[in-house]
Amino acid sequence: LVLVGLEKYTYEEGETLCADVQIANYGKTDCAGDLEWTLWAYMPNEELDSVRKVAVKSGHMSAVSCPKGTLSKAGTLKIELNNKITAPVRCDLTVKIADAVNSYPIWIYKNEMPKCPESVYETTKLDLQAKKVLDNGGIVYYSPKSEESSFHNSIRAQFSTDFWSVGTFGRQEGAMGQLIQKDHPLFKEFPTESHTNWQ
C-alpha cells in the first residue's frame, strides 16, 4: 500500500505540496522499483459539457526498496502547484510502485481574495445594519466566524460512518455529511461533488 502523508487537501496556486511517501508492505515478498506519481486535474470541457482528466505534473523516485513486513519511507514529494492551473480545480494525486497504486483528492484554488460588490453588505454578525439592509430589499452576505459563539446551537461537522454514528455512541457529534446539488450555478467556479469531501 502506497501512503502519502498530506498535511491538507486544499492548496492555493503557487504553494508547494510537500509530503512524505511510505510503502506499507505486509505481503509475502519484498517490493522494489521506481515510484511514479502523477497529478491529474479534472478540467472542464465546455464543448462537450463534461470534465476531462489531464495529467498536469508527474515524476518519479528511483530505486525504492520496500522489504516485506515493514513500513518503509520511499522519499518526499515536492510538487510546485503553479502555471498549469488557472481556475479552481479538483485533482487526484496518484502514486504507484509495482502493482500498488493509491490516489488522493486535492483541490487547488486561485491565490486571490474576492472583492465584495458595493451593492452587498458583508458581515460576520447578524447585526442591526444587516437587518436594515434586508428590510430595505438589499443583499446581505452573512459569513459568521467559525467559533462556538457564532454557532451555539450547532454541532461540529465531521465525517462519520453509519457504524460509528451517534446512534451507537451518543457522546460524539452527529453530523455525517451533505447531499449537494453539484450542478447548481453557485458551484460554477467551485469544484464539488454530490457529497461532502475535504475541500
Where would I find each of the regions flagged by the language model?
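A glycine-rich, often tryptophan-bearing local segment used as a flexible ligand/cofactor-contacting loop or short
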Residues: L126-Q199
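Outer-membrane beta-barrel proteins
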Residues: E7-Y9, N25, P67, L81-N83
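Short, structured interface segments
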Residues: D92-E112
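Proline-enriched interdomain boundary motifs that mark the N-terminal boundary
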Residues: V2-G5
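Short, solvent-exposed loop/linker segments at the N-terminal edge
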Residues: Y9-E15
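Hydrophobic beta-strand core residues of beta-sandwich domains
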Residues: Y11, C66-L71, I85, L134
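Beta-strand-rich binding/interaction modules
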Residues: T16-A63, S72-E80, A87-A98
